[in-house]
Amino acid sequence: MDKFIVHTGVVAPLDRENVDTDAIIPKQFLKSIKRTGFGPNAFDEWRYLDHGEPGQDNSKRPLNPDFVLNQPRYQGASILLTRQNFGCGSSREHAPWALQQYGFRAIIAPSFADIFYNNCFKNGLLPIVLTEQQVDHLFNETFAFNGFQLTVDLEKQVVRTTDGGTEYPFEVAAFRKYCLLNGFDDIGLTLRHADKIRQYEAERIAKQPWLNNRLVR
């Protein structure tokens, strides 16, 4: 998992409440057992004019010109600005996979669905909760200025405009912050203790060989 320390990027405004996980990545794309390749199908039903299916050549599909992510001014956006209760609906880890593989590193909203919020941290995507008033202000700024950018400083727990004129502090649990700063997912955290795990396994086999299908002589 990539480290998240400080990130500066273009902001894309998704001005919708209650965006559910089926909108983020529709159910037909959940058949894949791989963790990659979901980016082209993020927001598939809003992003394209036709019905998407796994295995399609997305480069040949007709784009919806009215969808925000298809507008030229938001191309290359890496910070998603949206409204309350983002990520609601059924639990699917494919949702943060799709957003991250699209290119987003952070999502700013007044609130998130709990399971989606937790899944974001496990996959290196930073969900940031700001007040509705702060989010409203950021929407106004994003609409007003082409290529509007923000800097997300996880170490200092602050979102700021690139000129440094405005700052928005945010909260994040210390353990989640530690994992993102160091690029640790669940597997990475476990592997940090690989020596102790091997030592435990060796001692367990010696003391309880029957648990390792070894004959006791």
Swiss-Prot record:
Catalytic activity: (2R,3S)-3-isopropylmalate = (2S)-2-isopropylmalate
Top-rank taxon, per record: Bacteria
GO CC, alphabetical: 3-isopropylmalate dehydratase complex
Disulfide-linked positions: none
Protein's UniProt keywords contain DNA damage: no
UniProt GO molecular function: 3-isopropylmalate dehydratase activity
Main EC class the enzyme belongs to: lyase
E.C. number(s) listed in UniProt: 4.2.1.33
Role according to the record: Catalyzes the isomerization between 2-isopropylmalate and 3-isopropylmalate, via the formation of 2-isopropylmaleate.
PANTHER family recorded: 3-ISOPROPYLMALATE DEHYDRATASE SMALL SUBUNIT, 3-ISOPROPYLMALATE DEHYDRATASE SMALL SUBUNIT 2-RELATED-RELATED
Family: Belongs to the LeuD family. LeuD type 1 subfamily.
Assembly: Heterodimer of LeuC and LeuD.
Protein name, per record: 3-isopropylmalate dehydratase small subunit
